[in-house]
């Protein structure tokens, strides 16, 4: 039974990041055939966007060193997008060679994380992004931008809202079609979410990406929906974190998100039973239980 709440959208796009943001943080290398089946299962469950992999140098993210082989194995379905993360122009070159049609770039809202993750300053990171976005747009690619540490980081504490907006507006100004606001270490709370989204002056080109470190991901998501956001990033079984932020724990679990949205009468186009089955299947291959509360509860009957 669904119970609507006033002021929420009729439909939400769940942007699945498990194959990229989830698997990049695994200690063991997941075989490429498992990754390909994982992505195919997600598409079969109704996902219209599945972030497939990353072209970050294998030295930094060895778990995704098989990006080219994986893309070659994908059974691409009509109506499903398979974006990839691209860190720089070399990564873009590889993506273009493989016929990718959508990419994502990854920015920082704080100086310290920009230095640790990108080896750049807050300002100089744009020297890297500008040619990537410009060339991608010239080739007809869609470009999405992630901004990490939007609510706080382990070194600088709370991130000033105006600092996040300044970074985000510049990325949108480059031509990115969407900005995903990331709570990389999970310190955000619903009021903070409302304030940040409101500071952008409109939610139309915003998405949210919450980690559940302090158990706030679903509450933060509800606040974002009330503020007008209609795209939410999530990861199968809550897998993932950030290789460069030790205090970052798992992503918002796709199954938990869909359970809440279904209860609110919000359409997603997703089959929860298939999502749970996929989460259980993946957990068996990763050698540990799914961290999704919904998957755990349904497993107990």
Model-identified regions with their sequence ranges:
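Catalytic cores and adjacent flexible loops of soluble metabolic enzymes
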Residues: 1-301
């Amino acid at each position: 039974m669904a119970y609507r709440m006033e002021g929420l959208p009729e439909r939400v796009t769940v942007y699945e990041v498990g194959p990229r943001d989830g698997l990049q943080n695994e200690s063991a290398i997941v075989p490429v055939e498992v990754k390909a089946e994982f992505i195919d299962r997600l598409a079969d469950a109704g996902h219209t966007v599945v972030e497939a992999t990353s072209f970050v140098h294998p030295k930094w993210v060895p778990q995704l060193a098989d990006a080219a082989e994986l893309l070659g194995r994908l059974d691409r379905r009509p109506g499903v997008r398979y974006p990839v993360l691209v860190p720089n122009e070399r990564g873009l070159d590889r993506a273009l060679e493989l016929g990718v049609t959508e990419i994502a770039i990854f920015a920082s809202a704080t100086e310290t994380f920009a230095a640790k993750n990108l080896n750049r300053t807050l300002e100089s990171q744009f020297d890297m992004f500008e040619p990537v976005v410009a060339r991608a747009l010239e080739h007809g690619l869609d470009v999405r931008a992630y901004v990490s540490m939007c609510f706080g980081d382990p070194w600088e504490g709370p991130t000033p809202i105006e600092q996040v907006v300044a970074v985000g507006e510049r990325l949108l100004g480059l031509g990115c079609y969407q900005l995903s606001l990331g709570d990389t270490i999970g310190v955000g709370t619903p009021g903070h979410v409302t304030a940040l989204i409101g500071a952008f002056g409109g939610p139309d080109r915003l998405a949210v990406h919450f980690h559940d470190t302090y158990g706030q991901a679903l509450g933060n998501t509800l606040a974002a929906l009330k503020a007008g956001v209609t795209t939410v990033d999530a990861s199968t079984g809550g897998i993932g974190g950030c290789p460069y932020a030790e205090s970052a724990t798992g992503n918002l679990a796709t199954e938990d998100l869909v359970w809440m949205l279904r209860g609110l009468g919000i359409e997603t186009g997703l089959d929860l039973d298939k999502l749970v089955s996929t989460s259980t299947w993946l957990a068996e291959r990763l050698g540990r239980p799914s961290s999704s509360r919904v998957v755990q509860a349904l497993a107990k009957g």
